[in-house]
């Protein structure tokens, strides 16, 4: 029997009278759920624990959701994550303040906030052109250096080695591999020198990310917050290194986002939290 799963695109409802952003998550639809819904591909909503979840299962529906900025707000969801992970209110207010159309740095013809521009900047990094070509070359070079027996044998998850090969748990190895790949390609090797254990800590956090998404209380989520805080702490150390010493090996997106944040006066602690979400976006999809 085939296993069906879909990403659930989430947003926060702006229903009248509701001030608190509603929590959104990415979930897998199991076979049982699909059978219950009779394999319908129509979008639907679920209300659980006082929260409304909007579920879409088709790419064309996802595009419509992203365009629907009147009733669905991804900014509310993102700001909620920023608070949960340590950004203070002043930083959030600064990042989501409307910027002039003639600002320096990344073009802002529609006069949007940096919080909104960040999404456009990430898309710009992946547009066909010099930035994408540079990223692709780095990925190819990284794979060429690391996809060999010597490197695989040194993998933390390698469990048995012999004269003819090495045994690794596939899921664990793929997760470690793609997290390290995304980190090195976007942030350069300086971050690994600062904290060689960062990918391992992030993987622990990633396995428990649902506790962050569902806003578990501190006393029930220390196993998630401890590795998360380690990752954020390492990112703070990374951005305390002069940019000239790391910019040559990092992606355009990372350097440009840092420049935009510093131009607004965002301090190192808040910068690290913002970049934690960018780190999350860069490595979580390949490793999931």
Give the predicted meaning of each segment:
Residues 48-51, 132-138, 155-182, 196-199, ...:
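Cytochrome P450
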Residues 64, 70-74, 192-209:
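Amphipathic alpha-helical scaffolding segments
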Residues 56-70, 111-152, 177, 182-191, ...:
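Catalytic cores of PAPS-dependent sulfotransferases
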Residues 96, 155, 190-198, 243-254:
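Structured alpha-helical bundle/scaffold domains in large eukaryotic membrane-trafficking regulators
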